[in-house]
Amino acid sequence: MTNGSHIMLDCTGAVGIDGDWMLSLMKKAVDASGARRVHSHIEKFDGTLSPPGFASVVLLDESHVSAHCYSDIGLLAIDAFSCGNTDPARIIEAIESEIRTKFPG
């Protein structure tokens, strides 16, 4: 029995990824997938309590898409989960394509 599908993407060398750009990209990918956005939020970290970077999330009617960036080590971890009809792989593929275009190599 399956209760959903979970896809993850880790990007290294993610230096200079802007949190607002990432959240906008996530929303665009969600909208293109046909999923219904419920809420979105970004939290930027200055390194005081957490490592510098950001965490962003787009809540979906059927689950979520999130991204966590650790700018001090250049790591961007993205995941998409759906317990509905939305294919999270489609969301991740759209995000990855835009990241590769903006940050080739």
What is each PLM-predicted segment?
Residues 1-105:
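Polybasic/polar functional segments that serve as interface/processing modules
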